[in-house]
Amino acid sequence: MKFQKKNRPRRAKFLKKYPFEFRKSLPIPKGFKIRPSSSVHCPSGILSKGELLNRYAPNNLSYMLNTPMSPFNLKDIRKDSASRSTNGVVTIPEVFSIYDNPDESIITLRKIISALLVETNRHVYFDYSRCHEIDIATQAIMDILLKEYDTFMTKAHKLQRRSVEREFAEGITGRNINNDNLRKMIFSIGSPAVLGITQRDFPDIIRNSMCSRSMLTENDRKNLSAMKELDTTDMVDYVVKCLAKMNKRLTPKKRNDLCTVFGEILINAEEHSSLKHRFSVGYFQDINENGKHYGMLKLVILNYGATIYETFKKNDSCPQEVVSKMKALSESYTHRNLFT
């Protein structure tokens, strides 16, 4: 009698492995230990996590970790046992959304930072087995965090190989992505795509991949106007493409209005941020369910650093009436402690 092997459904996952192996002379960590950088004792010539971050962390990551009011302040995360992962495993909540489930979502992002930058895990896992919904803004925040971490790791490994091999995990993995809609978002515009691991096409998805623009260097500033025009056109063309999927179109006037709106948002996100860096991403899904056919378009434009209100309140030439209105608008977003 022959027994047939059961065909089990494959669970989607992704893996980012860094180009080094742990040396046999190094102890394999069991679980994790909290290591405040001020009390870490490292062998001669080896830098601690804190020292490596101080030297090589990109601007956005450094801002997130060091700003006192940031929900991702590294000193606060070190002290908070609720922000630790489970032996390197971070379970993504059922609803991963800073809008609909802010407390649990912020804690999850803090756990990711702890797993990567505080604990001594050999590997870090993001477990999506419980998750059935992610909003695109929260996905973007997570992806930017991981991209900044990846940039940091690449630079630090080139310059301080021994220290990085001793202090950091050799890879990160997303696993148990069982929900079909989550799988489509994650593999089209999410972490695997942003980190350059893999990017997949789906017949019902139109993506506008993560765009990152900065004006930190002189060359960046010279190209600012041209890049803004290019990105504005790209975003409007993307919206037009999504509308065409639904057999809809924009009139020339409405297209021009949309160009004006996108252009203003992009330039505000760039010029009025203290970090002079903006990100944008778009995601469209063609949906047929319960006898209804419709499209869902989601766009995110964000930056890190000071808010527009914080920027203008320090400008003596800005009218006080405008500053007061901006303060009220800012407080409507910050009263839930989602943003600084």
Named regions from a protein language model:
Residues 1-195:
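N-terminal assembly/transducer modules of large multi-domain enzymes
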Residues 139-150, 240, 259-266:
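Short, well-ordered alpha-helical packing segments
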Residues 177-180, 212, 263:
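Short, conserved secondary-structure transition motifs
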Residues 184-232:
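Internal, well-ordered alpha/beta segment that forms a basic, Gly-enriched binding/recognition surface
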Residues 222-253:
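Intrinsically disordered, low-complexity linker/loop segments enriched in Gly/Pro
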Residues 244, 266, 270-274, 302, ...:
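Signal for well-folded cores of large energy- and translation-related assemblies
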Residues 252-289:
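Conserved ATP-binding N-box helix of the HATPase_c
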Residues 291-340:
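Glycine-rich/acidic phosphate-handling loop/turn and adjacent ATP-lid/helix
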